[in-house]
Amino acid sequence: MSHILDKIDTVYPFPPKPIPLTQDEKAAYIASIKQLLNEKDAVLIAHYYTDPEIQALAEETGGFVGDSLEMAKFGNRHPAGTLIIAGVRFMGESAKILTPEKRILMPTLEAECSLDLGCPADKFTEFCDAHPDHTVVVYANTSAAVKARADWVVTSSIALEIVEHLDAEDKPIIWGPDRHLGSYIANKTGADMLLWQGECVVHDEFSADALRKMKAVYPDAAILVHPESPASVVELADAVGSTSQLIKAAKELPQQKMIVATDKGIFFKMQQLVPEKELIEAPTAGAGATCRSCAHCPWMAMNGLKAIETALREGGEQHEIFVDEALRVKSLIPLNRMLDFAEKLNMQVKGNA
């Protein structure tokens, strides 16, 4: 059973959209980035939700495209001394937590995440302190400070198993920050959960009514849904899962058409694996001009070629991720707890967003 806190509607200030580059400008920045990666002993690591040209460049230069935890683990294993993380701030922090000896750069430190912004460490700590009998479980889409307050850090691929484990021990749970994912897990497990009221601005916009109408147009299509979406949307899904799990589902499901309810940045990698299938964007509640995110994270869009080139060329405090060592060590404890639990289950832990 879940206990849901009063929701506080938050309108996040979206960053301005990057100015489009000409083809000549793109070519010049790509050439410069390739040279700088070699000169700086650096590797480009990109999230599935970044623009297709960024994902393509990461793969072309021997880097990596994946979800948040996969990105951090790849950076930990790669011999490069500098990691350039094309994603949002908590992803750079996660890389620094796992690999403190390396230099972690980001195209911009202003690339935020609404889940992170909606879960300030001071307020979350205050809430946890008010419920000392609860085990604190936080989603990976959080700051290092929030992770440090947690007993467990989880990703969407292993959250069910960990919550089931805690529920079997009769432990009440505080879950943060995504209310939709928390509600999904509570309904699946029956666990006693207090849910922090955060949401992803992209997934929160998907509309069940609009999705039903689209399904009527494409009756033979499979519906793929990220569990950060509202419950009414999740109920319509043929497959529910993290970014990596949805890509896998697109490959394994027999349908030749896929309606995909997650950030449309995922289409680049998904289409690589299923070039013969038709991928269709799931509709958002705004339907066109009135949507806010329009199925693409506005902060992910900040990871452009110009910003990547500048980060590699100039570095500095505007681009480098630092995590206080005491905080890093503390946040590593719940993260390692998840990894150890997964190893015992012989699971390959995938990321979330």
Curated annotation (Swiss-Prot):
GO MF term set: 4 iron, 4 sulfur cluster binding; metal ion binding; quinolinate synthetase A activity
Cofactor(s) listed: [4Fe-4S] cluster
Transferase among keywords: yes
Residues noted as binding [4Fe-4S] cluster in the record, renumbered to the chain: C113, C200, C297
Enzyme class per UniProt: transferase
Pathway: Cofactor biosynthesis; NAD(+) biosynthesis; quinolinate from iminoaspartate: step 1/1
EC nos: 2.5.1.72
Gene Ontology CC: one annotated term: cytosol
Binding site for iminosuccinate: H47, S68, Y139, A140, N141, S156, H226, P227, E228, T243
Protein name: Quinolinate synthase
Native source organism of the sequence: Vibrio vulnificus (strain CMCP6)
Organism ancestry: Bacteria, Pseudomonadati, Pseudomonadota, Gammaproteobacteria, Vibrionales
